[in-house]
Regions:
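Hydrophobic ligand-binding cavity/cleft-lining segments
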Residues: 1-44, 146-147
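Amphipathic alpha-helical segments that line or abut small-molecule/effector binding pockets
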Residues: 13-16, 130, 134
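Residue-level detector of beta-strand structural context in well-folded domains
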Residues: 4-6, 64-65, 91
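Beta-strand/loop substructures that line and gate deep hydrophobic ligand-binding cavities in soluble
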Residues: 79-131, 147
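Glycine-rich portal/gate segments that line the openings of hydrophobic small-molecule binding cavities
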Residues: 36-82, 88, 96, 101, ...
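Alpha-helix N-cap/helix-start motif
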Residues: 18, 28, 59-60, 86, ...
Length: 147
């Protein structure tokens, strides 16, 4: 499972302010290119956001579903990206003297992507999520500073 950790200069609540707004998903998730909709009540367990991934005009429409939510500490989602497959993504947020410590874990769980050996897949996932967690930190801290 690819794991990325970063110290954010904002509160755990500020991180969840971003996670609660499904429309912000493409601003911080590398590869997500646009939002098409969010279920009422997002991010309640079982709700979905409807997004696309890829580079226009080569985009694929799919969804991400909330599996677990323990705000402001933890959000677990299942991101679909067929034909590549699906991944379980965990976002854990802990208080830290400088704001909060965010851990992002991702593991392919369904489809062809889950058949790729970890030692091949995980470095690429880690590299992509390094940028995703960086973007999430900027969005959360920026929104908190302007609140």
């Amino acid at each position: 499972m690819a794991k990325n950790v970063r110290i954010f200069h904002c509160s755990p609540e500020a991180v969840f302010d971003v996670l609660r707004d499904g429309w912000l998903y493409p601003t911080w998730v590398v590869g997500a290119s646009r939002m098409r909709g969010a279920d009422p009540g997002w991010p309640a367990v079982g709700t979905r956001i409807h997004h696309s991934f890829g580079v226009w005009p080569f985009v694929i429409n799919d969804t991400t579903t909330v599996l677990e939510r323990d705000e402001p500490r933890r959000l677990v989602i299942q991101a679909r990206g067929w034909p590549v497959g699906e991944a379980r993504v965990e976002v854990e947020v802990e208080p830290h003297p400088r704001g909060c410590r965010v851990t992002l874990r991702e593991n392919p769980v369904e489809g062809p992507g889950s058949l790729v050996p970890g030692f091949i897949a995980q470095p690429g996932i880690w590299f992509r999520n390094r940028e995703s967690i960086r973007r999430l930190s900027w969005v959360a801290a920026g929104r908190a500073a302007n609140a």
